[in-house]
């Protein structure tokens, strides 16, 4: 019996909606990263993008445990000398709550070409509305 290797053309992609209301950032992000990679499928192949599309709604209602709202910092670089920008997560969740989930999920994906193609399948929205009704996404409840 030969080992099965998925080919990009034969991957059937589904759309899932995940509600982030009152979910912990890290636990939600690890579950989303697993779906984006395709680890929930029996055809999972590490070097092929076998994952599904994920829509995360209510990103503004995400929770952080402990005092991470004040202590944890979100950093990004503008590309210019001295361009390191830093803000705490309380400010980030007020200004751009989608960015908190995107950054957490991106850190859990492969840091290469494959990971960059996987992150494009993640759609995050701060409210409960999203423009992807035509794809007929199914609601997915998280474990735990």
Curated annotation (Swiss-Prot):
InterPro entries tied to this protein? Ribosomal_uL13, Ribosomal_uL13_bac-type, Ribosomal_uL13_sf
One GO term of the biological process aspect? translation
Q: Name one GO molecular function term.
A: mRNA binding
Q: Name one GO cellular component term.
A: cytosolic large ribosomal subunit
Keyword set for this entry? Ribonucleoprotein, Ribosomal protein
Domain of life, per the record? Bacteria
On subunit structure and binding partners, the annotation says:
Part of the 50S ribosomal subunit.
List, alphabetically, the HAMAP family matched: Ribosomal_uL13 (MF_01366)
Q: Which PANTHER family match?
A: LARGE RIBOSOMAL SUBUNIT PROTEIN UL13M (PTHR11545:SF2), RIBOSOMAL PROTEIN L13 (PTHR11545)
Similarity section: Belongs to the universal ribosomal protein uL13 family.
Function, as annotated, reads:
This protein is one of the early assembly proteins of the 50S ribosomal subunit, although it is not seen to bind rRNA by itself. It is important during the early stages of 50S assembly.
> What name has this protein been given in UniProt?
Large ribosomal subunit protein uL13
What species is given as this protein's source? Syntrophomonas wolfei subsp. wolfei (strain DSM 2245B / Goettingen)
Q: What is the lineage of its organism?
A: Bacteria, Bacillati, Bacillota, Clostridia, Eubacteriales
Q: Which gene encodes it?
A: rplM
